[in-house]
Amino acid sequence: MLHTLHRSPWLTDFAALLRLLSEGDELLLLQDGVTAGVDGNCYLESLRNAPIKVYALNEDLIARGLTGRISNDIIPIDYTDFVRLTVKHSSQMAW
């Protein structure tokens, strides 16, 4: 399943998101959700321990001035990669 986090993790039921993640799922951080991938925040360690790959939309990182502050564990992607993820996963959950 593809999970997309478009809101700040501080304004989302992040614990519920983590509970619903399964091995093989993927999470895309976009819009204000990219803040979850910033080094040093309380949500990043939870994402590191999850059995998933985590991506961040590069355009949203740039728009928020976060390109140099994002963790190396987060994979920056462009819109073409975003489309590939949506095609790859038949089910999606937006947060």
From Swiss-Prot:
GO annotations of cellular component type: sulfurtransferase complex
One GO BP annotation here?
tRNA wobble position uridine thiolation
Q: Does the keyword Cytoplasm apply?
A: yes
Is Disulfide bond one of the keywords? no
Quote the subcellular location field of this record. Answer: Cytoplasm
The protein's UniProt keywords, in alphabetical order, are: Cytoplasm, tRNA processing
| HAMAP family associated with the record | Thiourid_synth_B
Function text: Part of a sulfur-relay system required for 2-thiolation of 5-methylaminomethyl-2-thiouridine (mnm(5)s(2)U) at tRNA wobble positions.
Please give the subunit comment from the record: Heterohexamer, formed by a dimer of trimers. The hexameric TusBCD complex contains 2 copies each of TusB, TusC and TusD. The TusBCD complex interacts with TusE.
- UniProt record similarity statement: Belongs to the DsrH/TusB family.
Q: What's this protein's name? A: Protein TusB
- Organism encoding this protein: Escherichia coli (strain SMS-3-5 / SECEC)
